[in-house]
Each structure stands twice: as structure tokens, then as C-alpha cells.
Amino acid sequence: MRRAALLLTIALPIAANADIVDIKWADGAFTHRASIAPKKFLEVCGKQKMGDVVGWTFNGSAAADFNIHYHIGKDVSYPENRKGVASAEGSLVAPLDQDYCWMWTNRSAQSLEMEVRLKQAKVEK
């Protein structure tokens, strides 16, 4: 019993510092704030349809590696990939129906704070 409690004490903080967050749109917008522990990541993921446009912006307290990616089988495609940036903005035009993830990796020895904002653009069909 003691061993199980000790393992939980060790495992829970590790899992809590590598976050995967589902995008929950509210009136076409999504905002998320998180602390990213050293050598951990934050990933914000959601389903987009081909042609959907999502404006994105983020501000961090320190530089992180950033990408937007999606998986097709074992292959990973990166519509956006930047190294060592504390803030950036842009837009994603979804090339196909897929789950897309915005991801930040903290390669430093210090925690960093991150604020992410996504906004769905209205697309004329």
C-alpha cells in the first residue's frame, strides 16, 4: 500500500505538467492559460474541417518550441513549426478534415507561463 501511494505521489505531478487540452469553443473562441514545467509540453487539440480558418496567438513568459501538427497514420505533418519563440500569431487554414494540435515544448530548466488564444474565422461557403 505504501509503495502504491509513493508511486502515485511521484506520477501525478509528472502527468500534471505535460498537458493535453481539448479545445472547447465558446462563441468561436478559445483561451487557455497554463504553466509548462521544465522539459514538458502543452498541447491544445481539436477537430477542424478542411478549409476552416483558425486565427491563433500566444504569449509566454519565456521562449518555447512551437508547432501546429496533425497525424495521418504514423506520419506527422506540420503546417507551422517554430523554435525558441515566446510569442507569435498567425492563422491555420485546415488542409483536410483532421484533429489539429497547437503544441509548446519547454526545453528550459525553468517553468514558463503560456497564454493561448484561438479564434474561428467565418468562412463564406
What function would you assign to each model-found segment?
Residues M1-A4:
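Positively charged n-region of N-terminal signal peptides that target proteins for export
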Residues L6-L8, S61:
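Short helix-onset patch at the extreme N-terminus, typifying the N->h transition
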Residues T9-N17:
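Hydrophobic h-region of N-terminal signal peptides that target proteins for export
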Residues A18-K125:
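Acidic, Ser/Thr/Pro
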